Amino acid sequence: MLTFQQMILTLQAYWDRQGCALLQPIDLEVGAGTSHVHTFLRAIGPEPWRAAYVQPSRRPKDGRYGENPNRLQHYYQYQVVLKPAPENILVLYLGSLEALGLDLKQNDIRFVEDDWENPTLGAWGLGWEVWLNGMEVTQFTYFQQVGGIDCKPITGEITYGIERLAMYLQKVENVYDLVWTEWVENGETRRLTYGDVYHQNEVEQSTYNFEHSNTEILFRHFAEHEGEAKRLMGNGDGADAAAETGTRLALPAYEQVLKAAHTFNLLDARGAISVTERAAYIGRIRNLSRQVAQAYYDSREALGFPMCGQRDGARA
């Protein structure tokens, strides 16, 4: 049996052999691995890119106080980004399942059409859910547009739901029963479970998300992050320096967009935003994402798209 961390190490080793740069998660609160700068921005423009990483993901509304066996407000995704998307991407994915010890002939693996869209990032793609014996464990996406910019070439994204896949591999019904790691100490096998690591966090973060977050402070934070992103894009209050020099700082601005997006998610979980306001807030974040995407594209174009000379992909 693979432990939770052995499963991650196995995926790391497998995608390393496929030429991926093994990166670290972005050190900000995000709702999915797609929001990582090395997926969202790297999908823009013609430069090749291959990367893989674990991404802790937060979705405040999905918290259940640690009482639901398979629903979490904090969970993990394993993200693989291949640009341009190789013709054998499905073969590569199935190979990763075999590396995890799955017998493809003994298990029911289905690809169910499920096109993907992220309104706040102005991104969408054609894709499939991957179902393993009736349970969704992976999302496949061929990015068509990111930040309002058409993807040329197409980027292939593979997003594993690590907890769900691990629950099947370990044959447990409750995520908190997953074996995170095990070792032998004084002749006895010791185990650390997912619940040991994260159950208290789920209880307390759910309590904060739904009951104790300060909406007044959160609304102020949203306005601050939005304003800072605008300033770094050369518009809004205090944007004179960026506007005069023509310097738009896409990467710092994108971090502000991500902070604004997470703040919005906290407000949404708290029930502080009406249905009408929700659409308006999403539109504001999407507008910033598009500005950042264009600024990033322009900055890479000004450099002559330097990674286009790398024939076999891009390793960091």
From Swiss-Prot:
EC numbers on record: 6.1.1.14
Subcellular location(s) of the protein: Cytoplasm
GO annotation, cellular component aspect: cytosol
GO molecular function terms listed in the Swiss-Prot or TrEMBL record: ATP binding; glycine-tRNA ligase activity
Catalytic activity line of the entry: tRNA(Gly) + glycine + ATP = glycyl-tRNA(Gly) + AMP + diphosphate
Biological-process GO terms, alphabetical: glycyl-tRNA aminoacylation
PROSITE patterns: AA_TRNA_LIGASE_II_GLYAB (PS50861)
Alphabetically ordered keywords of this record: Aminoacyl-tRNA synthetase, ATP-binding, Cytoplasm, Ligase, Nucleotide-binding, Protein biosynthesis
SUPFAM superfamilies: Class II aaRS and biotin synthetases
HAMAP family in UniProt: Gly_tRNA_synth_alpha
NCBIfam families: glyQ, PRK09348.1
Self-association state and partner proteins as the record states: Tetramer of two alpha and two beta subunits.
Protein family per UniProt: Belongs to the class-II aminoacyl-tRNA synthetase family.
Name this polypeptide is given: Glycine--tRNA ligase alpha subunit
Species annotation: Cupriavidus taiwanensis (strain DSM 17343 / BCRC 17206 / CCUG 44338 / CIP 107171 / LMG 19424 / R1)
Lineage summary: Bacteria, Pseudomonadati, Pseudomonadota, Betaproteobacteria, Burkholderiales
Gene: glyQ
